[in-house]
Amino acid sequence: MALRNKAFHQLRQLFQQHTARWQHELPDLTKPQYAVMRAIADKPGIEQVALIEAAVSTKATLAEMLARMENRGLVRREHDAADKRRRFVWLTAEGEKVLAAAIPIGDSVDEEFLGRLSAEEQELFMQLVRKMMNT
């Protein structure tokens, strides 16, 4: 079977197209940063370690990303007074502003791709992805 007909090759191409479109529309915010900001907005003061899943990254990579975001003034982190190993994360006012502007753009990029499928196909697609991820 030709490589162009392999499922994971096509998925990789799809993700590359989506990422290129994302970077064009939101050049100052990566998809992992966006996902982390959405998770923080959903649960202000979230424990840093809980953001690993949202970032789809390692603990070290997440810590580096949050440090960069903190330097940009998008998030603030605080240590737990009782346990310095624990850190909690909030969006700053600037982070809230950036996220508020990014959400409709990110949704639009996603819809540009998902809109190629009917509502039924979108539901089936999500079911199949969840099944393959075993969740």
Swiss-Prot record:
Coiled-coil region? none
| InterPro entries for this protein | HTH_MarR-typ, Tscrpt_reg_MarR-type_CS, WH-like_DNA-bd_sf, WH_DNA-bd_sf
- State the SMART domains in the record: HTH_MARR
Portion annotated as DNA-binding:
48-71
Q: Which domain of life is it from?
A: Bacteria
Q: Name one GO molecular function term.
A: DNA-binding transcription factor activity
Domain (HTH marR-type): residue spans on this chain: 4-134
Keywords (A to Z) from UniProt: DNA-binding, Transcription, Transcription regulation, Virulence
What does the induction field say?
Expression is modulated by temperature, growth phase, salt and pH.
Answer whether the UniProt record assigns the keyword Zinc to this protein: no
The signal peptide here is none
Biological role: Involved in the temperature-dependent positive control of flagellum-driven swimming motility and cellular aggregation. Regulates fliC expression by directly interacting with fliC promoter.
Descriptive protein name: Transcriptional regulator HosA
Please give the organism. Escherichia coli O127:H6 (strain E2348/69 / EPEC)
Q: Its encoding gene is what?
A: hosA
